[in-house]
Amino acid sequence: MRSVSEEPVPLHEEFIYCCGAATHVLKCGPWKDLSKDESKNLPRLLFMIIPGNPGLAGYYRTFIKALYCGLNQQYPVWVVSHAGHCKPPSGMEMIEDTDIKELEDVFGLNGQVEHKLNFLKKNVSKDIKLVLIAHSIGCYITLEMMKRASELQVLRSVLLFPTIERMAQSPQGKLMTPLLCKLRYALYMPVYLLSFLPEGVKASLVRFALRGMKTCDESSITTSVNLFSVDCIANILYMASQEMMKVVERDSTTIKQNLKKLIFYYGTGDSWCPQNYYDEIKMDFPDGDIRLCEKGLRHAFVLDASKEMAAMITDWLRDDLTKL
């Protein structure tokens, strides 16, 4: 595998309805359709990114491009937003999904799991193997996907900064739980008022909020402007409130059943999944591939370390890919 290239990367962008919810999909590579209808030219493997929260696909734009190049442009790399976390551009045609029934609560944590499973069922052939790369709460969603759909041909699941247990008890969770569970509605009016600002002013506000970072991915700034939408922020905060209440006990049974397929990557200063969570899971699963970050990467690595993370993942998966 070669290092990340600066050459142009084919990137396809689409907005669809999945389970009745607006969904943003970014696809790296020439493959736009991986359904069974085009089985003759299908790749053997799909890399699918399950985002954190906020689950906007645009945050992972640089990451999937870097990963695609690091994989020698041999495999498609897709990222699927969480249901309702995207604001479709005005005038952009939405592709209606008529084959999948609407979920009762697609914006909640359970609904987001079913949303990803339904997306795969509709858009990816069963013959294609999967590498699931999950970030933050996406790791919880990925473990649930593997639990509920054992028929998925998952070659590997890479769980980055995994929030898979005791979220409300984490340092950040203790601060955010009261806000998310009791006071989140108070944020809607300020967001509504800010939504009327010109796009340039919104971008300036985002830059100001991220001013403490030495370098910040430009696509992260552009994507963050979407947070000035009441619909998006309501769905983001609602999902986050459910995370605090529902992500309590680690699903050690599912981890044990899939241990050989899993790679865990914990941070050293992560206030959402502190290092003692790493110490405990490492003790419980001594034979697991459970790593501790030695590079000082932040939980929200997509803000400034997408290329570095992509390079590490391609190195981790080198042996698996040579066996295909």
Curated annotation (Swiss-Prot):
Catalysed reaction equations from the record: a cholesterol ester + H2O = cholesterol + a fatty acid + H(+)
Gene3D superfamilies (alphabetical): alpha/beta hydrolase
Active site: S136 (nucleophile), D270 (charge relay system), H299 (charge relay system)
InterPro entries assigned: AB_hydrolase_fold, LDAH
Protein location: Lipid droplet; Endoplasmic reticulum
SUPFAM superfamilies: alpha/beta-Hydrolases
Key words of the record: Endoplasmic reticulum, Hydrolase, Lipid droplet
Matches recorded under Pfam families: LIDHydrolase
GO cellular component: endoplasmic reticulum; lipid droplet
Protein family (similarity comment): Belongs to the AB hydrolase superfamily. LDAH family.
Main function: Probable serine lipid hydrolase associated with lipid droplets. Has low cholesterol esterase activity. Appears to lack triglyceride lipase activity. Involved in cholesterol and triglyceride homeostasis; stimulates cellular triglyceride accumulation and cellular cholesterol release.
Name of the protein in its database record: Lipid droplet-associated hydrolase
